[in-house]
Amino acid sequence: MGKGTDKLYITHSEWASEDAYSASAGAGVGKARRGGENAGFRRLPFNFCSLSLQPFSHPVCTPSGTIFDLTSILPWIKKHGTNPVDGSPLKSSDLIKLNIAKNESGEYVDPVTYKVLTDNTHIVALRNTGNVFAWDTVERLNIKGKLWRDLVTDEEFSRKDIITLQDPQNIESRNLSTFNYLKEGESALTEQQIREREDPSNNVNFNALGNAAKILKAKEAVAKARAERAQRAESGAASKGLTKPGMSATAASQKTVSHQAGKPIPYNAARHTTGLAAASFTSTGMTPHTSAELALLSDEEYMLKRGRVKQKGYARISTTLGDVNLELHTEYAPKAVWNFIKLAKKGYYKDVTFHRNIKGFMIQGGDPTGTGRGGESIWGKYFNDEFEGPLKHDSRGTLSMANKGKNTNSSQFFIAYRALPHLNNKHTIFGHVIDDPTPSSPTLNNMETHPVNPTTNRPTPDIRIKDVTIFVDPFEEFLKQKQADEAKGTTVTDDTKTSQEIDDDRITWTGKRVRGPGATEAGESSAGGVGKYLKAALANQANQGEDEIVEFVDEGPEPEPAKKKFKGGGGFGDFSSWD
């Protein structure tokens, strides 16, 4: 029987791709999900705020006719200073308060004709008064009647004062898929709203819990009372200055501080532990550990966390056709920027050619072999993609990593000649061409128009990288700043433990006292008993560890063993004597 190949699921790469296809949604699912060209139309009702996406209570509008709720747009303007819908600059003084009439049922109506305003009504507002009317009313009574006065307040206005809030013939203005802050993933919530939503107790309907609600409220009250009581006790002890007999005041204050604050967590502590406590608990061959210690990250691992180093990097690629100045986005692609800077400082890109150049597409280089199949990262292996962030292939001069597939970045990179949206979430963007301090656009234009081999797209003659100069290394600046901060504000802490703390670490949770590593009981012979084998094994492990750091020497292939010659010991031979 044949083997079915029609899977009932799609892989993550297929779902994340721009060319994703779904039987129920058709082609372009990825673009629709990200707000691309084929994104589904989602209409916002006219009585909804364009920022909170909820019915407004204090409506205001911009000069372009976008409606917001005053309580939602003011925090946004204070933080960003832009219009969240189209990204244009916006000030609080630009907002126009809207006066919308209501009928007895609470529906929004035209104040003259009392016609109910719906999603299909052409709605306008007057800039100077803020009164909202149906377009039919203004057109029939004001424009055609040449009566340029507000029908409610009798104030004069001009045609320029008419602002369109909703036009059924132009529904794109209310299309959620085109809103700028939604496409970029910006949150419209304030910090207080975020804290309220993250609080688990706010997501529980206590009225529907019955007796359980009373228990939860009682637990919260008890916990709050205990916290207040503990705080009063600590403040009282600190004010009275209680010390043990024979203990100095300095030692007592140090003991109090260490009890309250605990051991300071190192700046490079990871979120996971070393695992020694779990390993010693499950294996008798491990040295017992009763405390969980956080693993420490190296300086490189610490800096290469996304968003840790936020300073931009700056470099220049000097080619045979001119210089190309680059701005490196360290905050969004730290691994790619680190790899590029380290390879450049190492001289890896010197005299390397651009092996691929396609007009209207991109130019690719960074392979020392010049074939497009070579290249190695600073770690000697591939490193993962970095797609999180707002960076897209949306303009000319985008600098990205070339790869052979998912998580296969090495040393090769390319510079785009135009917007390449189909490469989004497929290639890591880590920089952009800039015209500072010298113009880079002429060099990029010369590269694009340079003659190439039509079969291989290889430039003829070669476009060669003379050198890559690093002007600003953000990682060095970060380390210098950190060292300066440590020299100014940090104090030396004493990591030595008292005898009582050491005894606490040697007592397990079962109450059994555990000997420290290398300790022997009084009267025990160091040469006898089972322990001598354990010591021998530890010595062997130490010797093996020293051998591992010896430099590898290639002595050449081992000689092949000589083939054994079998002596004839009878048998039929080659059957030549047979008749």
Curated annotation (Swiss-Prot):
Protein name (record): Peptidyl-prolyl cis-trans isomerase-like 2
Domain PPIase cyclophilin-type: 311-470
Gene Ontology terms for molecular function: peptidyl-prolyl cis-trans isomerase activity; ubiquitin protein ligase activity
One of the protein's GO biological processes: protein ubiquitination
U-box domain location: 42-115
InterPro entries for the chain: Cyclophilin-like_dom_sf (IPR029000), Cyclophilin-type_PPIase_CS (IPR020892), Cyclophilin-type_PPIase_dom (IPR002130), Cyclophilin_A-like (IPR044666), PPIL2_U-box_dom (IPR026951), Ubox_domain (IPR003613), Znf_RING/FYVE/PHD (IPR013083)
Reported function: May catalyze the cis-trans isomerization of proline imidic peptide bonds in oligopeptides thereby assisting the folding of proteins. May also function as a chaperone, playing a role in intracellular transport of proteins. May also have a protein ubiquitin ligase activity acting as an E3 ubiquitin protein ligase or as a ubiquitin-ubiquitin ligase promoting elongation of ubiquitin chains on proteins.
Localization of this protein: Nucleus
Name of the gene encoding the protein in the UniProt record: cyp8
Region Disordered, residue ranges: 227-261, 555-579
Keywords: Isomerase, Nucleus, Rotamase, Transferase, Ubl conjugation pathway
Source organism: Aspergillus fumigatus (strain ATCC MYA-4609 / CBS 101355 / FGSC A1100 / Af293) (Neosartorya fumigata)
Pfam families listed in its UniProt record: Pro_isomerase, U-box
Any one of the GO CC terms: catalytic step 2 spliceosome
